Amino acid sequence: MKSAQYSLVLLLGFTLLYLLPLEFRALWQPDETRYAEISREMLSAGNWIVPHFLDVRYFEKPVAGYWINNLSQMIFGHNNFSVRFGAVFSTTLSALMVAWLAFRLWRDKTVAVLSGVIFLTCLLVYGVGTYAVLDPMITLWLVAAMCSFWLGANAQTRAGKAGGYILLGLACGMGVMTKGFLALAVPVLGVLPWVIAQKRWKEVLLFGPLAIISATLITLPWALAIAKAEPTFWHYFFWVEHIQRFAENDAQHKAPFWYYIPFLIAGCLPWVALLPGALKRSWNERHIESGTLYLLGWVVMPLLFFSIAKGKLPTYILPCFAPLAILLARHATQLVATPRTLKVNGWINTVFGAVCALIVLLVLAPWGIAKHPIYASHEVLKVIQASIAFLVWALVGYLTTRNNARLWQWAALCPLGIALLVGGMIPDKVVYSKHPQAFVDLVRPELESSRYILADSVGVGAGIAWEMKRSDITLYAKPGELDYGLTTFADAKDNFVSRDDFASWLALHRKEGNVSLVKLLSKDSVLEDSDVPAPDKVYHKGRFLLFFYEKTP
């Protein structure tokens, strides 16, 4: 295949996987609705220094990730595409840097291109990279740090080394402004094995201060600005968001040490058969190829760091897939002459896709053996779409086994069916619990006529705020992640109404206009709710419930 044709195929595949589906999937709560609304409020208020969420100060993250999302919404407007494009943009830049680093290491265009392709199509990378969270942004800056250090360490002149370390500091500084101080810890841990093995301590001590200075310079303006505007920000962000989340017994999302192992393995689909050999080859070559040791350090050390931390989420290990993709690509190119592993990889994809399709048809479908099927009887079309999505995975996997020496790279298209069909195969049980936009569409006239809107879920409230383009959503009964902002700042007290106070609050405020209370029911809850006054209208769909109170004289 000629270079121009190859480039066209890559561009087409990227468009189908990463760009085309973005608009046609509803936003998920709480994550996507949160980040959509925070950026919308930043743009609306013109305040790019202090994040606000539902008109409440929100200190869980710094601002650089929001800035990327802000720019996306400025360019593309108020739609699902713009909400997710910041993540796609960051993931794409990360893939380009992965390809660049692979080429710098081995001067092999095939390995370089495959590294970027494998990175983009790893299941975890694809899932997070098209989802509106901040992890793709922090991954971007950590990959930039990985590349910058290698650039500086291998420069032949003092100026080149200084430039690499300055870029390293800038990347780390932007990482701090995206998700905090782990952007300093992860690069240090990642390069540590290589620095020790290569005995580069003198160089690091000589040029390292340049990285510290550049990181400080790029971070300082915003750090001072938010400290002046909100003096409590740094105390909360450092102690609560870092110490408690990563070390203390009450850390969020606690999980065992081995938690990330299954996510690392499954996250490598559709390339998972390459993983054992790639890691083994890298370990065996660690003393022969310094670049291999460097990449291995960037995989293992952050993985250990996040495994030791008590708070864990699958998205935290996203940066590990950048060096891992290069190791997988290089290992794969070494296997072409003896492609048994490549054939095994094809069969794994075939079995995975076929088994998932069978689970949909025989277990999850309305006629399936599950006691409570996830699909309802009227969702046959969704069952068909889900089955086709996984059958595409199986079919592509099977095709790669027919001539695996030539076609194994086409495994990159395994996720294509899911990418194109996932928006239409989500069961209503999920839609009407995780997609507030769907419920808003059903009750839009009531919400538009409401002077006050309350929600007992921050994620649902964010979805309503985004859809209605209004940030004055009052939280009811459950402050959730806005608890700090609601309890710390006196000007936020009107943004929350307790269950006990609701009746008196309603009697007073419905004189000013209609009131809507949107609730997210628990899975086992009943429709009746004796805790609130009788509404004039009730709308119920799935786990979403709207109590509508008309204005009183």
UniProtKB/Swiss-Prot annotation:
<dbReference type="GO" id="GO:0006493">
    <property type="term" value="P:protein O-linked glycosylation"/>
</dbReference>
<dbReference type="InterPro" id="IPR003342">
    <property type="entry name" value="Glyco_trans_39/83"/>
</dbReference>
<feature type="transmembrane region" description="Helical">
    <location>
        <begin position="288"/>
        <end position="308"/>
    </location>
</feature>
<keyword id="KW-1003">Cell membrane</keyword>
<feature type="transmembrane region" description="Helical">
    <location>
        <begin position="111"/>
        <end position="131"/>
    </location>
</feature>
<feature type="transmembrane region" description="Helical">
    <location>
        <begin position="350"/>
        <end position="370"/>
    </location>
</feature>
<keyword id="KW-0328">Glycosyltransferase</keyword>
<keyword id="KW-1133">Transmembrane helix</keyword>
<dbReference type="InterPro" id="IPR050297">
    <property type="entry name" value="LipidA_mod_glycosyltrf_83"/>
</dbReference>
<dbReference type="GO" id="GO:0009103">
    <property type="term" value="P:lipopolysaccharide biosynthetic process"/>
</dbReference>
<dbReference type="GO" id="GO:0103015">
    <property type="term" value="F:4-amino-4-deoxy-L-arabinose transferase activity"/>
</dbReference>
<feature type="transmembrane region" description="Helical">
    <location>
        <begin position="380"/>
        <end position="400"/>
    </location>
</feature>
<keyword id="KW-0472">Membrane</keyword>
<dbReference type="GO" id="GO:0000030">
    <property type="term" value="F:mannosyltransferase activity"/>
</dbReference>
<keyword id="KW-0812">Transmembrane</keyword>
<keyword id="KW-0997">Cell inner membrane</keyword>
<keyword id="KW-0441">Lipid A biosynthesis</keyword>
<feature type="transmembrane region" description="Helical">
    <location>
        <begin position="8"/>
        <end position="28"/>
    </location>
</feature>
<comment type="similarity">
    <text>Belongs to the glycosyltransferase 83 family.</text>
</comment>
<keyword id="KW-0444">Lipid biosynthesis</keyword>
<dbReference type="GO" id="GO:0005886">
    <property type="term" value="C:plasma membrane"/>
</dbReference>
<dbReference type="GO" id="GO:0009245">
    <property type="term" value="P:lipid A biosynthetic process"/>
</dbReference>
<feature type="transmembrane region" description="Helical">
    <location>
        <begin position="176"/>
        <end position="196"/>
    </location>
</feature>
<feature type="transmembrane region" description="Helical">
    <location>
        <begin position="132"/>
        <end position="152"/>
    </location>
</feature>
<protein>
    <recommendedName>
        <fullName>Undecaprenyl phosphate-alpha-4-amino-4-deoxy-L-arabinose arabinosyl transferase</fullName>
        <ecNumber>2.4.2.43</ecNumber>
    </recommendedName>
</protein>
<feature type="transmembrane region" description="Helical">
    <location>
        <begin position="204"/>
        <end position="224"/>
    </location>
</feature>
<keyword id="KW-0448">Lipopolysaccharide biosynthesis</keyword>
<comment type="pathway">
    <text>Lipopolysaccharide metabolism; 4-amino-4-deoxy-beta-L-arabinose-lipid A biosynthesis.</text>
</comment>
<dbReference type="GO" id="GO:0010041">
    <property type="term" value="P:response to iron(III) ion"/>
</dbReference>
<feature type="transmembrane region" description="Helical">
    <location>
        <begin position="255"/>
        <end position="275"/>
    </location>
</feature>
<keyword id="KW-0808">Transferase</keyword>
<keyword id="KW-0443">Lipid metabolism</keyword>
<feature type="transmembrane region" description="Helical">
    <location>
        <begin position="317"/>
        <end position="337"/>
    </location>
</feature>
<comment type="function">
    <text>Catalyzes the transfer of the L-Ara4N moiety of the glycolipid undecaprenyl phosphate-alpha-L-Ara4N to lipid A. The modified arabinose is attached to lipid A and is required for resistance to polymyxin and cationic antimicrobial peptides.</text>
</comment>
<feature type="transmembrane region" description="Helical">
    <location>
        <begin position="407"/>
        <end position="427"/>
    </location>
</feature>
<feature type="transmembrane region" description="Helical">
    <location>
        <begin position="83"/>
        <end position="103"/>
    </location>
</feature>
<dbReference type="Pfam" id="PF02366">
    <property type="entry name" value="PMT"/>
</dbReference>
<dbReference type="InterPro" id="IPR022839">
    <property type="entry name" value="ArnT_tfrase"/>
</dbReference>
